[in-house]
């Protein structure tokens, strides 16, 4: 999930999915018709040029490689980390190059299953929640937190369901007939 967090930073989901698919097909292991996500060892051994050829910017390629190296050298252990408090996870992830607040909240929610984790700086999420709670206007990070406060300790989960509903609704609206 940490590599996925890096690939999704400041990109549309479509662009991030495309990059991830290229990473997986280039460095992952084929399992019949499916692919296994690349191991940390495989990504750590890749050159920056090879990683960039999958669509990553040079900086993101450095982040992916650096993160993979931290994992392979035992400096970052996600199995141990998931047992820690949210604050301890934040501290450890922010120490890794390429991780900011958005990536940490993403990892807390998707990587560690913390239902209250909320990436309040996410522009798309602020737009979606603003549609439902802000009279159609994109919310500020503070407004997003206040709008979802009644859902605590499940703010991240509530935001996820709102985003899914938003996407499904838009998909139906675009479907002819």
Predicted regions: what they are:
Residues 1-177:
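HhH-family (HhH-GPD) DNA N-glycosylase catalytic core used in base-excision repair
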């Amino acid at each position: 999930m940490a590599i996925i967090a890096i690939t999704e930073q400041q990109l549309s989901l479509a662009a991030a999915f495309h990059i991830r698919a290229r990473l997986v097909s280039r460095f992952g292991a084929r399992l019949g018709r499916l692919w296994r996500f690349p191991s940390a060892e495989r990504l750590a051994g890749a050159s920056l040029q090879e990683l960039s050829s999958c669509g990553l910017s040079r900086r993101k390629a450095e982040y992916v490689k650096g993160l993979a190296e931290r994992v392979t050298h035992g400096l970052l252990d996600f199995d141990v980390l998931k047992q820690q408090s949210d604050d301890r996870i934040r501290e450890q992830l922010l120490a890794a190059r390429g991780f900011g607040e958005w990536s940490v909240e993403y990892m807390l929610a998707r990587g560690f299953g913390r239902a209250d984790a909320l990436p309040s700086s996410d522009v798309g999420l602020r737009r979606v929640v603003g549609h439902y709670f802000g009279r159609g206007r994109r919310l500020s990070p503070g407004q997003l937190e206040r709008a979802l406060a009644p859902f605590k300790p499940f703010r991240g989960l509530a935001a996820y369901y709102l985003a899914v509903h938003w996407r499904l609704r838009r998909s139906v609206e675009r479907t002819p007939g």
